Swiss-Prot record:
The keyword Metal-binding applies. The gene is menD. It comes from Synechococcus sp. (strain CC9902). It comes from the Bacteria. Its cofactor is Mg(2+); Mn(2+); thiamine diphosphate. InterPro entries: MenaQ_synth_MenD, MenD_middle, THDP-binding, Thiamin_PyroP_enz_TPP-bd_dom, TPP_enzyme_TPP-bd. The lineage of its organism: Bacteria, Bacillati, Cyanobacteriota, Cyanophyceae, Synechococcales. It catalyses: isochorismate + 2-oxoglutarate + H(+) = 5-enolpyruvoyl-6-hydroxy-2-succinyl-cyclohex-3-ene-1-carboxylate + CO2. This is 2-succinyl-5-enolpyruvyl-6-hydroxy-3-cyclohexene-1-carboxylate synthase. HAMAP family: MenD (MF_01659). Binds 1 thiamine pyrophosphate per subunit. Keywords: Magnesium, Manganese, Metal-binding, Thiamine pyrophosphate, Transferase.
Length: 568
């Protein structure tokens, strides 16, 4: 544990268990000396998502420690998300020694293999037990795990698994603890092993695009580390200035709202974005959550270059782009860019005028009074939130509605959503982790996503993070209402797909000590937000909507948007 702290570990999420007792004791001693921030969690699945939220916000690996057996299996959903989202996560599991393997011993499984397919690297302690390893071997294991989690060997950051067999006796006498802590505190070494930061390298020669010819930049969700974001943002700005290309950005791209050429309502006008010649396309990271954009790219695009932030795996489901994994900042540095500002072309200026007209039109359509619709909620909410307040959007309808309906205000803040595997798993726990690291935050989630991770409320007890949870309660899986599924199976749609649950979310939150309020009409949203943001810990705001009516409303709005004429 001390070795990991020397490398940069600052936070650890600890789950209960006997076999992991020595790890728990070490974490407790280091936390008591101020060297480690310690969170505890009884549900390993929720704990791993909490750690992932912390790591995403902080830009550095957070450890989650569990005992043996099914505890390890419960880590898999968060490990998959960390893998697909390219975020560092350090999973440390206690295991039985080799003598208890494959002989029917209790709580003994092949846990060393459970997480392997989704991990950047898996390491094991000595089969006989951690006690059989020399100190330098333990430190080498820690150093290797830490470097792999942060993107060693030309890979992107991601999860690693340290599986540590522990032999009995597994609980040292109390009098043996203090000498260990004294030894740690007495060490005057600056570092056990200084770790040199890895440099992202490309998997091939640098592909080129011509900024003097027409093109477009499409920015998907940011998949780099927090500390690399500033350089990425500057690189985007430099390319936009020298090329004069418009920008179609996902709210999760973490790009500033005032970037030149940025379209805020592009998802509503893709059919109108026409160019007389095939456009070059600079794609940043994975595609935004828009099937219409995929169709548009297939129909309109010329040469495409896809830049990832160290992710060497193929990331183009359309099969249209040349991929380069060295990161955008390095890509821009590898080719000479004209520093002179290039204006938007006449065609692209028309795109921008239409975008501005759509913004004014949406103000008229998505009014701040009357019953709550989900498009109006996304539009109004983005305007009402304090400047700079970050938002997490659950990976279902909320993230799609924010992309389409929130407009300029929705892009004027940092937005998070864990769409690596596009699941609703761990939604509340992820948001708790983000808020613990960033401070006040808003989570926008659906009812099934919140209920699926209701154990996340446990992280809000006693000094919980300042998290406002805005629950869109539409009686089931509203995302399915927007797909052709209902027409294919109209009679049993609710039972087979929407799956509404009879749970009172306000009462469930209250059972965990979390206060809550219900919002009846959208007029009440400003006062409810003011109350929620004034609370010291987690709070729940429940908004009831009609998923049937909202699905029809979205279709109506999207159809009408095609007739909005651009301003002069």
């Amino acid at each position: 544990m001390q070795g990991l702290i020397e490398l940069g570990l600052r936070r650890l999420v600890l789950c209960p268990g006997s076999r992991s007792g020595s790890l728990a004791t070490a974490a407790g001693l280091l936390a008591s000396s101020g060297q480690l921030q310690l969170n505890t969690a009884i549900d390993e699945r929720s704990a791993a998502f909490l750690a992932l939220g912390l790591a995403t916000a902080g830009g550095s690996a957070v450890a989650v420690v569990t005992t043996s057996g099914t505890a390890v299996a419960n880590l898999l959903p968060a490990v998959i998300e960390a893998d697909r989202s390219c975020q560092p996560l350090l999973v440390i599991t206690a295991d039985r020694p080799i003598r208890l393997k494959a002989c029917g011993a209790n709580q003994t499984v092949n846990q060393e293999d459970f997480l392997r397919p989704a991990c950047r690297w898996c390491g094991n302690g000595a089969p006989e037990g951690l006690h059989a390893m020399a100190s330098h071997a333990v430190l080498e294991l820690a150093a290797l795990a830490w470097s792999q989690a942060h993107g060693a060997d030309q890979a992107a950051a991601g999860p690693v698994h340290l599986n540590l067999p522990v032999e009995e006796p597994i609980h040292a006498p109390l009098q043996e603890h203090q000498p260990l802590l004294d030894a740690v505190l007495a060490s005057d070494e600056a570092s056990l092993f200084p770790l040199q930061p890895s440099t992202i390298q490309s998997n091939r020669d640098v592909p080129r695009l011509d900024p003097s010819r027409p093109g477009v930049v499409i920015a998907g969700p940011w998949r780099g580390l927090a500390q690399d974001l500033s350089a990425h943002q500057q690189a985007v700005r430099s390319w936009l200035v020298c090329s004069g290309w418009p920008l179609l950005a996902d709210p999760l791209s973490a790009l500033p709202v005032e970037l030149p050429g940025r379209l805020h309502h592009w998802d509503l006008q893709l059919e109108q974005l026409i160019s007389p010649e095939p456009l070059q396309v600079l794609r940043l990271g994975p595609l935004p959550a828009s099937r219409r954009l995929e169709v548009w790219l297939k129909r309109n695009a010329g040469d495409q270059v896809l830049i990832t932030e160290g992710e060497p795996r193929y990331m183009d489901p359309l099969g249209l782009a040349t991929q380069w994994s060295g990161g955008l900042a390095a890509w821009c540095c590898a080719q000479p860019l004209d520093q002179a500002s290039r204006p938007l072309s006449a065609d692209h200026s028309a795109w921008l005028r239409r975008d501005q007209a759509l913004g004014l039109w949406l103000e008229e359509q998505l009014v701040s009074e009357g019953p709550v619709s989900e498009p109006a909620l996304a539009f109004q909410l983005a305007d009402l939130l304090p400047p700079g307040l970050p938002v997490m959007l659950s990976a279902s309808s909320p993230v799609r509605d924010w992309l389409t309906w929130s407009g300029r205000s929705g892009s004027d803040r940092r937005c998070f959503s864990f769409r690596g595997a596009s699941g609703i798993d761990g939604t509340l726990s992820l948001a708790m982790g983000l808020a613990l690291e960033t401070g006040p935050m808003l989570l926008v989630t659906g009812d099934l996503a919140l209920l699926h991770d209701s154990n996340g409320w446990l992280h809000g007890q006693s000094d919980g993070p300042p998290l406002v949870v805005l629950l869109i309660d539409n009686g089931g899986g509203g995302i399915f209402q927007q797909l052709p599924i209902e027409q294919a199976s109209p009679k049993r749609f609710d039972a087979l797909f929407a799956m509404p649950q009879r749970v009172n979310p306000i009462a469930l939150a209250a059972a965990h000590g979390v206060p809550g309020r219900s919002i009846a009409v959208i007029d009440d949203l400003p006062e409810a937000l003011s109350w929620a943001l004034a609370q010291q810990g987690p709070v729940l705001l429940r908004v009831c909507t009609d998923r049937h009516a909202d699905a029809a409303f979205r279709r109506k709005l999207r159809s009408a948007a095609q007739n909005v004429e651009p301003g002069v």
